[in-house]
Curated annotation (Swiss-Prot):
Residues 36-74, 1554-1576 are annotated as: Disordered. Residues 1-164, 473-495, 1179-1318, 1387-1395, 1454-1473 are lumenal. Component of a flippase complex consisting of DNF3 and YNR048W/CRF1. Interacts with YNR048W/CRF1; the interaction is direct and required for proper expression and endoplasmic reticulum (ER) export of either partner. Residues 51-60 have a biased composition (Basic and acidic residues). The active site is at 566 (4-aspartylphosphate intermediate). InterPro entries: ATPase_P-typ_cyto_dom_N, ATPase_P-typ_P_site, ATPase_P-typ_TM_dom_sf, ATPase_P-typ_transduc_dom_A_sf, HAD-like_sf, HAD_sf, P-type_ATPase_IV, P-type_ATPase_N. The lineage of its organism: Eukaryota, Fungi, Dikarya, Ascomycota, Saccharomycotina. ATP binds at residues 566-568, 765, 813, 815, 818, 838, 1034-1035, 1114-1116, 1167-1174, 1202, 1208, 1232-1233. This is Probable phospholipid-transporting ATPase DNF3. The modification Phosphoserine is found at residue 627.
Amino acid sequence: MGIADGQRRRSSSLRTQMFNKHLYDKYRGRTDDEIELEDINESKTFSGSDNNDKDDRDETSGNYAAEEDYEMEEYGSPDVSYSIITKILDTILDRRRTFHSKDGRHIPIILDHNAIEYKQAATKRDGHLIDERFNKPYCDNRITSSRYTFYSFLPRQLYAQFSKLANTYFFIVAVLQMIPGWSTTGTYTTIIPLCVFMGISMTREAWDDFRRHRLDKEENNKPVGVLVKDGNNDAQEVYTLPSSVVSSTAYLTKSAAAENNPPLNDDRNSSQGHFLDTHFNNFELLKNKYNVHIHQKKWEKLRVGDFVLLTQDDWVPADLLLLTCDGENSECFVETMALDGETNLKSKQPHPELNKLTKAASGLANINAQVTVEDPNIDLYNFEGNLELKNHRNDTIMKYPLGPDNVIYRGSILRNTQNVVGMVIFSGEETKIRMNALKNPRTKAPKLQRKINMIIVFMVFVVATISLFSYLGHVLHKKKYIDQNKAWYLFQADAGVAPTIMSFIIMYNTVIPLSLYVTMEIIKVVQSKMMEWDIDMYHAETNTPCESRTATILEELGQVSYIFSDKTGTLTDNKMIFRKFSLCGSSWLHNVDLGNSEDNFEDNRDNTNSLRLPPKAHNGSSIDVVSIGDQNVLDRLGFSDAPIEKGHRPSLDNFPKSRNSIEYKGNSSAIYTGRPSMRSLFGKDNSHLSKQASVISPSETFSENIKSSFDLIQFIQRYPTALFSQKAKFFFLSLALCHSCLPKKTHNESIGEDSIEYQSSSPDELALVTAARDLGYIVLNRNAQILTIKTFPDGFDGEAKLENYEILNYIDFNSQRKRMSVLVRMPNQPNQVLLICKGADNVIMERLHDRELAAKKMADICTSTKERKDAEAELVLQQRKSLERMVDEEAMARTSLRNSLSSVPRASLSLQAVRKSLSMKNSRTRDPEKQIDSIDQFLETVKKSDQEIGSVVNKSRKSLHKQQIEKYGPRISIDGTHFPNNNVPIDTRKEGLQHDYDTEILEHIGSDELILNEEYVIERTLQAIDEFSTEGLRTLVYAYKWIDIGQYENWNKRYHQAKTSLTDRKIKVDEAGAEIEDGLNLLGVTAIEDKLQDGVSEAIEKIRRAGIKMWMLTGDKRETAINIGYSCMLIKDYSTVVILTTTDENIISKMNAVSQEVDSGNIAHCVVVIDGATMAMFEGNPTYMSVFVELCTKTDSVICCRASPSQKALMVSNIRNTDPNLVTLAIGDGANDIAMIQSADIGVGIAGKEGLQASRVSDYSIGQFRFLLKLLFVHGRYNYIRTSKFMLCTFYKEITFYFTQLIYQRYTMFSGSSLYEPWSLSMFNTLFTSLPVLCIGMFEKDLKPMTLLTVPELYSYGRLSQGFNWLIFMEWVILATTNSLIITFLNVVMWGMSSLSDNTMYPLGLINFTAIVALINVKSQFVEMHNRNWLAFTSVVLSCGGWLVWCCALPILNNTDQIYDVAYGFYNHFGKDITFWCTSLVLALLPITLDIVYKTFKVMIWPSDSDIFAELEQKSDIRKKLELGAYSEMRQGWTWDKDPSTFTRYTDKVLSRPRTNSRASAKTHNSSIYSMSNGNVDHSSKKNFFGNSSKKSSERYEVLPSGKLIKRPSLKTQSSKDSIGGNITTKLTKKLKLPSRNVEDEDVNQIIQARLKDLE
């Protein structure tokens, strides 16, 4: 017990609240039995229905606080140890402490607030229940995701501002400056600007937080219905129920429907006449008889003890104790996807004793009970409490335990239940989801700020050094020239030591610019707006643009090393799709949803049948989304009445148009409208599984001939009596029978008369039932044990047939059994019962009647799979070693083969090799074609591609197929050369064949002998399972068994006894189920796709290429997480997956062994999978945690499943703390991701369909995961480069300018005199050098976005801090110092020592000033800035021209005749001297020339990655490839609606033809390119988009996807360079990691044509 007690953190609460203790004890092998409330709860029948993943949830935990939480645990009243000073500090700093009561919180369950018991527990003033810990009312239900309060903003912001070292430095200087007699520049010239600049920064931060407050207000003001028993009601407060509840206040459950036996589960049949008038949902009865009204309250107004009424699809506003509900068996379902990431619905039940009281209206109105619950805590998976009811018979109090099945938490959604009444037990910040959020999120600061602070420290040291140096010079000159009355006219006056030193410090202190941070704030505001205005990151479906809520850390978007992503709703689309199935040894693709997916949103929005560009073309077709109703499109694809070639499908002209659709309602239900049709089954090309399927598996290259359900249904309709057709129909029937879905017929006229809503707690079953409907087996109704199915025996166009099946028993699925069974009495088999079982492949295979054969085949498949994966891994390792040798053979030999996977950021090996290869080429020639050739040579030798991995897969599977041909004979379908032999005679069947297309189907199916060959079917089925699993699909194996009626009845008695047993019920039920689930016959396999969002796989692959490690942290179960890992390519086919569990005997040895293997380079790709229970164990052991973190930093990826929100935050914090220079990014969409988002350096929220919880607290929000690519690779890189260049240019100009002051002191005996005129000196940073640094900080783009997206390896520039570091800073300091020396000394020599007109301070300073202003402007805008445009020229003209105007205006400001002759010197003296102008010109040009020569020499000798690709992207052929590679990311911006005249003016400019101003001419010209009315592109080759120009123009130019016109290479030039550059296109395609297929001209032309259409 000592060990267990040591694990407890809240030992005196109602329960320990330490579920880590249970896990730790379980891990340590504790066997002593303790009786706890949870054990009692599990022994009762009322504890809730069996949940598939309950055991997994009980093992998962996360009882810890992330490091940012400031949490203090006290028991009893806080007044004892909670001092007044601590309270004040907590209020000011907005710190939150957690206190605990001695025996839990006691809450009366009373609807009548006038009852004596309620008044005793409530305050007299407002009637709110009292929190015993504070003797104050419980907190309200307001939540706050903002970072500051009214009281905490000022102290926290002052801390944040003075953490910027420059502000601290200037504050000290300002204090010294205000000391009388010390300052020579005024008293308040530093403190006032400092306060203004800090005020601007604080105002911007206040505005950002104000927006968060505004979003909080939106959620806090949501309405909810509250039951109130009060005679005085305000009519305006009465809550209006949803129409669905008003129309059917008494929703009939399955049991009620069985009693009334209606023909359908129809809402209209659930009328007032069928329900119990005393039921709680008779709201009229509650109102009229019991004076219970439904009031509308805002969420924030809810208090503990309120009775909340929820209706279907409502969000749960607070943590509620269930009182009653109208679901079947008093059961309700909640979706907790936003809470813990689980996709399956959870079953919840009110306590049976409590439900007895509140089920009736009278009981609900008059209930008087009490509940004692635990104090607020972070444990999402456990709950403990006591229900106290009074026994009126003997006046005793009965206590009943409450468990997690009796409560529903905030962040959940009520599903499949009409009405629920619950009482608030935790509100606001004390709810579970808010307790898991960080209570005191830290103020985020960029990593670059730390470097800036160090540089400022260095500059302070420099200022102090040169100030002391100047003072030393002053002392020496004073002794030499002033002391001993040598300068008698000064009367030996001395200012003193301190004033003299301070004068130098004040003169030099602006080397550190005072406006540094405020200028950076202005730049970052513009940067954030440019991100928000990016149309490529706009999600049209949800109308969600990119939103920047924090401008402070913009540059960190370009430095990310780790990405932590949620799964549900972030990577996935929250949809389960029935994608593939295997039947009798042949695999089939179910692609019914591909033509009607949400990807058509843009097309449906305009209601036009338009073509959209695909991510990958197939078989020469570039159709990605096609409306099947467009016959023109079908004609172009060949689906018309024209003769059908081999391999093509028949025409759809005779098929009725599809009108079926599916409307998903979360993961709980789907409304299916319309009847099945052949047109609905018709899909696009076979290989298009979904957006992400194109990169799911390399096996597609071999499996591209897979047939679809369209082909299968057509075959069944043509040959209904064939053996395969009979088995297929039986398989479809099994899909429709073996499930627990509830069909509900709806009669919403707007939906359609044939619409049926399927409700299920499992999204997988929802996908199976909808697939059965697609295939012609419609689950129509369920009444008691009768399941009605509508079939179409004569085809979808024929008359439907209703069949009734009696469901005798359900054997439910759970996490131990991993299978589900249903026993059915078939209509035509009265003496037999059909058992249909579905489950995991290993579970079903070991229960087949020939299990030995299945086991042998499974072993063979496993061996083959292992050999294939080993071959793939070996290929990857060889490629990596070759890559390392090419970079640096000697250096890499001394380092680990896996050093690129360590936590220390490293450069891309591919780019290093490219640079080395190009440098070797450059030593001989600068031929660009040889540059490309060198890149291609490098990639061909060492770079892995999907085709090479695919070739390994194909070779392995072809070898297996060859063995099958040798074993089963040449008439097997995979041979493809022999006609299969079915029951129908060959000659007869050949006469019935109309097309060769039928032959392909028959060859795919195989002969009857093969279909009946059990060994063959099992082998092919296991092979299909392997292929499906590799693609990341969730597989289920179906099996069946016929049972004699007598055998069934005997078993049913035993099964009934097990279900009614009072002891060990669960074990006995499982044993009885296992008894009947034996000796099964294999039926088929289904593969369900957890649909990823568009572009997720491609995005993750590019993220990996960028050198960013991606982790997936999810609350879902392990199997689901691993499947998604395969789907999104987080786990490769050849990956070594290391699973860490609490059952591992020596887990630390296991982790060390894996770490050593990774270090040795023997693992090609390593992924660690860990669950929440194991993480909880690691938390209690620092040694385990340190070893685990070290292992994770070496692996390629980590998947953490069953993770609580706090555990997600802990994982992020642990990695963030390993290296302070690493930048972490967390992305999620739900409330369970808030803590993770706040813990990371950068938090990105997905503002999607499931609410704005994560988006509200995030730093940046986007609509889809794929937008992360442009956010990081383009805007992140630009922001990092702009900020770095701004910092460098700022320090450069300050050092260049103020070092001239130091040099000039030698000519003034170090007197502290300034070289420059005071007004000019004060305006230097404001008027003459602010624009160039602002422009480079706002608009710098070193490379084009298409280059950055196509070559993600370039992202390492920011990740490795190559844009701003000490080396680069010192390089700029040396350049600035050199220029200062050149300018000042040459000025003295050329003007000061030779001028006869005026060689005083004023002209010397004027020449210096002119040269420095010109140098800074030209260097910033033309030397350092890559995208030179009109803004660069404008800023230079304004700055330099403004300085000249200023010089002319200075005499007006200084109109008095003084020795310092400003008033007349320029016009009357040196301004007329040609030497002055020549000196100014030479000093302005010479430093600029030296800078240009230095930069050119550097680019030629040591080119950076940016230099290489900046040159390559200027070439037309390379730009074309780059645009094609980035088309999917930039398509929206390129194809967005634009002004047609823009393209007209552009083409006029390129073609050098006269511009026309006639609108009619422009309209005619545009109409000749494309048609705006119907949105269709004219593909006619006769169309000339160059208007009235000659055909030579169209032959000379082509249009890129971006709309840019480029010249076509001439045929003569192309042929002459065929030997050298003929393969440049192919080579560059490999380099840029474009799709693996060859980019054919017709594909490019289709992109161009679509681009021309979208330019309208």
